[in-house]
Amino acid sequence: ENAMTHYMASFGTPSLQCAMNQLSNHDHSRFLTRTNHKVGRAVNLGTQAASEGINRGVMKEAVIVQMTWPGAPTLYYGDEAGLCGFTDPDNRRTYPWGKEDKMLIRFHRDMIRIHRENPAFCTGSVKFLHGDRNILCYTRFNREQQFIIVINNDGYTRNVEVGVCGAGVPKACKLTQIMYSTEENYSMAPVTYQVEGSYLSLTLPKYSAVILRHLTGED
C-alpha cells in the first residue's frame, strides 16, 4: 500500500491514467510462473519447472488489481491463456494454440468488459480503505459509481471488516458483487452485501478477490 501510494504521487493525473499496467513483459518471467516462487532460469531448472506449482488464484487476484487500478491495463500475449515462462528468452514462447487455459481466457474477457463498461475504473478517484497482512482493500469511485475491491492473498480464509465511508457510499446500503474469484474458478453472480454503520464484513477464502458495486441513488 505504501509503495503504491508513494510511486503514484510521482505521476500527474493524465500520466497516471494512461500508464501501462503490466503483469508480464518480454524482459521478465511471466506472472503466472512467478506465483510458484521458483527463482532461476530455464537453462538451470528446465522449461517444465515454469509451469509447476503455479497458483491461478493469485493470477486472478493480480488481474483484478490490474483492471481496477488507475492506468491502462496492458496484456502481454499469452498471459490470458495461462502461458508460463522464466525470464528472457523463456518468456517469449509461442502462443499455446490448442492448449489454452479456457477459464483464464473467459476471466480476462469478463474483467476487460468490467473495466471498459465502468468509467470509475478509467477516470475515477482511488483510495485505500483497509490493509492488513496479505489483505488489500481499496475503492474506485466517481459521482455515479462506487466500487470496493477486496483481495485476500493469504493461504487461508480471512474474515475482513472494512470501513467504507471513504468510498462515498451511504452508512447503510447494499453492495452488489460483480466479480468473485477463487483459486479454482470465478463467478459474476450478483450476490448482495450489506453495509451497516459504514462497515462491511465479509469472509474470503484463500487466494480470492471480490469486486463490489454501489450506484448513487440506488438505495
Sequence positions of predicted segments:
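Alpha-amylase-like alpha-glycosidases and glucanotransferases acting on alpha-linked glucans and related
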Residues: 1-73, 130-134, 143, 196-199
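Aromatic- and carboxylate-lined catalytic core of secreted/periplasmic carbohydrate-active enzymes
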Residues: 8, 95-129, 211
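Short, solvent-exposed turn/loop segments enriched in Gly/Ser/Thr/Pro and often Arg
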Residues: 25, 77-85, 127-130
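Conserved, mostly hydrophobic/aromatic
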Residues: 26, 66, 78-80, 111, ...
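Short catalytic/ligand-binding loop motif for oxyanion handling, primarily in non-cytosolic enzymes
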Residues: 28-32, 83-87, 157-159
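Carbohydrate-binding surface patches
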Residues: 129-169, 211
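Solvent-exposed beta-strand/loop surfaces of large extracellular or lumenal domains
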Residues: 177-197
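C-terminal beta-strand-rich structural cap/linker in extracellular carbohydrate-active enzymes
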Residues: 191-219
